[in-house]
Amino acid sequence: MTDLTMLTIAQARDSLKKGDFKATELTEAYLQAIELANPILNAYVAVTAEQAMRMAAESDNRLAKGEAGILEGIPLGIKDLFATYDVHTQGCSYILDGFKPKYESTVTANLWKDGAVMLGKLNMDEFAMGSSNETSYYGPVINPWRKKGSDEKLVPGGSSGGSSAAVAARLCVGATATDTGGSIRQPAAFTGTVGIKPTYGRCSRWGTIAYASSLDQAGPIGRDVRDCAIMLRSMASFDRKDSTSVDLPIPDYEKCIGQSIKGMKIGIPKEYRLEWMSTEVIELWQKGMDFLKEAGAEIVDISLPHVKYALPSYYIVASAEASSNLARYDGVRFGLRMPGKDIVEMYEKTRSAGFGDEVKQRILIGTYVLSSGYYDAYYIKAQKVRTLIKNDFDQCFAIGVDAILTPVTPTPAFGLADEKIKNDSIAMYLNDIFTVPVNMVGLPGVSVPAGLSSSGLPLGLQLIGKPFAEEVILQIAYIIEQAAGTFSAKKWWP
């Protein structure tokens, strides 16, 4: 029998329905792969082996009765930001040490309803704050990719680095992730996987640990475009428990795969051409335009004049919302509690010990921009800029642009021990320069691998769509995928 971990979601789904193998066999193959590789890659922070085998056995029963859901028997990894009933959920932060929720997030509940199997919880940057998966309390995740002729450890991107690394290393068929400023798309680009950040409101945020509530959105990371389409259909839903959830029909995203894009207008924003950007990324961007032109699309130049202000505005808004959301972690009701002579000292010691440096930095920034005298100067101004950025995108779509093509990141994955980036917050934040405008406006965006750098590392292109037009950007992403091919890391781990 072929290595079952090499199958995509679509291939595994079809084979399970035909009875080529059982869900328990597929799940066991992944659990064995995790046991060997996780000590090296550190993608999982908790492995739920017994629960996985139980869920797989239930899937086999439903498959035998012809009652299969759209993800029946498919083993998935779950980012540690999603609440999973009675299973370790900490946002990879020490302050939530030992927390096991007595409720299930809407996104994961949707997946289980459709027959998916949970392999475990995936590593991530603490509270989703980071671009390299180095801020996790459980240590960094190692990218399965390596440069040609080098054994240097590379970052997998962040904050969903565990999700992207696990998918790339065949430690799950697909994974849930979240995206506040690029945390699905950037890790996908760094690991040669596909990741889609849906429109804000498409997937419920209920039961997902909040970072910045007006920016957070759940989405899938998969091995190819079709897999992301299949997962997104299950993850998306209207949810009355989430006041920002949108009550719109959920399309069968897989049906758009393979459809023609002839006559579509693809916008190329001039503001994304940065002087310091890698020439390889510029060449890849041009190659992506050529792929789409050959498929019958029309390439048009557009302008998004206010996106140059997106990154600083994003870090003001995100930090402000984070400082408010993280105020709930006080050691009183759940998670870590440090001893103190009174409640104030207990608060101080708990939060000081429980939060990592990056989280503390963002809380301090957020508290500052929300403080008296600075609220108008920073937070209100950032929200006004956000409106201007939205207007720029609205104007482009109003003139008939169907989607916008940009790079995902200015460079390929960088080294885990890259002190130049590690010790420079601005350099780290610049990893999100092409992705944050999408979150500021709430639009859908997908990252698709489009080539390799000269050092053999994957590079991705981003497609940005109109609100709730995920099927359009998936349709276009599939064209790029077919032209560029798919990319797999050469296995060096056990």
From Swiss-Prot:
<dbReference type="InterPro" id="IPR020556">
    <property type="entry name" value="Amidase_CS"/>
</dbReference>
<keyword id="KW-0067">ATP-binding</keyword>
<dbReference type="GO" id="GO:0030956">
    <property type="term" value="C:glutamyl-tRNA(Gln) amidotransferase complex"/>
</dbReference>
<dbReference type="InterPro" id="IPR004412">
    <property type="entry name" value="GatA"/>
</dbReference>
<dbReference type="GO" id="GO:0006412">
    <property type="term" value="P:translation"/>
</dbReference>
<dbReference type="InterPro" id="IPR000120">
    <property type="entry name" value="Amidase"/>
</dbReference>
<comment type="subunit">
    <text>Heterotrimer of A, B and C subunits.</text>
</comment>
<dbReference type="GO" id="GO:0050567">
    <property type="term" value="F:glutaminyl-tRNA synthase (glutamine-hydrolyzing) activity"/>
</dbReference>
<feature type="active site" description="Acyl-ester intermediate">
    <location>
        <position position="183"/>
    </location>
</feature>
<dbReference type="Pfam" id="PF01425">
    <property type="entry name" value="Amidase"/>
</dbReference>
<keyword id="KW-0648">Protein biosynthesis</keyword>
<keyword id="KW-0436">Ligase</keyword>
<feature type="active site" description="Charge relay system">
    <location>
        <position position="159"/>
    </location>
</feature>
<dbReference type="InterPro" id="IPR036928">
    <property type="entry name" value="AS_sf"/>
</dbReference>
<keyword id="KW-0547">Nucleotide-binding</keyword>
<protein>
    <recommendedName>
        <fullName>Glutamyl-tRNA(Gln) amidotransferase subunit A</fullName>
        <ecNumber>6.3.5.7</ecNumber>
    </recommendedName>
</protein>
<dbReference type="GO" id="GO:0005524">
    <property type="term" value="F:ATP binding"/>
</dbReference>
<dbReference type="InterPro" id="IPR023631">
    <property type="entry name" value="Amidase_dom"/>
</dbReference>
<comment type="function">
    <text>Allows the formation of correctly charged Gln-tRNA(Gln) through the transamidation of misacylated Glu-tRNA(Gln) in organisms which lack glutaminyl-tRNA synthetase. The reaction takes place in the presence of glutamine and ATP through an activated gamma-phospho-Glu-tRNA(Gln).</text>
</comment>
<feature type="active site" description="Charge relay system">
    <location>
        <position position="79"/>
    </location>
</feature>
<comment type="similarity">
    <text>Belongs to the amidase family. GatA subfamily.</text>
</comment>
